[in-house]
Amino acid sequence: MAPKLQWPIVTELTTASASRGAATGSRGVAPAVPRGGAPADVAHPQTIKSFVRRAGRTTAAQARAFEDLGPRFVVPYAPIAPIAPIAPAAPAAGAWFGRDAPLVLEIGFGMGEATAHIARVRPQDDFLCCEVHRPGVGALLKRIAEHGLTNIRILEHDAVEVIDHMLPESCLAGVHIFFPDPWHKSRHHKRRLIQPPLVARLAARLQAGGYLHCATDWQPYAEQMLQVLGAEPLLRNTAPGFAPKPGYRPLTKFENRGLRLGHGVRDLVFERRH
């Protein structure tokens, strides 16, 4: 049995796994009140970074993709409420995509391989994808052009600020968080992305019946995810424990490399209660 864990508050969110060479870099926001499993006697620091900035080179092709496709597919960060989290309201997704369709948020897409695949196999859904690693954004823009995708929009901004100030409650049909940085060392576990404050924020923004899908190849992190998600009162597990891999999520180059190294991959799919 995994040891009982204590959860510090996280106010800055990673947007991709460090092992994928991702980067983030924006200021934190005021911490949320933890719920669903955070012990009352835990000290909650004002700001705990869940990432470090890593350099990355944008290729000429990625730069061209920014120039040609950025105006259409990269959404500017425009907070509705710059101080307090926004109240329930209609999201701006209809204006972003030009249609009314189920909206899925992705936090951290690396180089966009899985994102583009999922958008292809689920053309009925729209995908709002947060990533601040510019080479990754450029790579996804290239994939959008290559596959003629129209149901992806990118926000090159810190995900927590997007969640707090651009997404109203009950606006999301789903959330994808695939292979976030596991922060292997014990002293860095406080920096892990999947912790009660973030999960509570996301659960509040899911529609009834909406889902939160996480995946990781680090077993201790998978167990932590299972405990944190299971403690959120607005969510229920769709499986007895870890879930079978949903058919829409592909095996990426990153994941196949992990499997060759003997890293088992765990999926977790939780649903917003009605």
Curated annotation (Swiss-Prot):
Residues 16-40 are annotated as: Disordered. It catalyses: guanosine(46) in tRNA + S-adenosyl-L-methionine = N(7)-methylguanosine(46) in tRNA + S-adenosyl-L-homocysteine. Gene3D superfamilies: Vaccinia Virus protein VP39. It comes from Verminephrobacter eiseniae (strain EF01-2). The gene is trmB. Belongs to the class I-like SAM-binding methyltransferase superfamily. TrmB family. Catalyzes the formation of N(7)-methylguanine at position 46 (m7G46) in tRNA. This is tRNA (guanine-N(7)-)-methyltransferase. The active site is at D181. It is an enzyme of class 2 (transferase). GO terms for cellular component: tRNA methyltransferase complex. Substrate binds at K185, D217, T252, K253, F254, E255. Its EC number is 2.1.1.33.
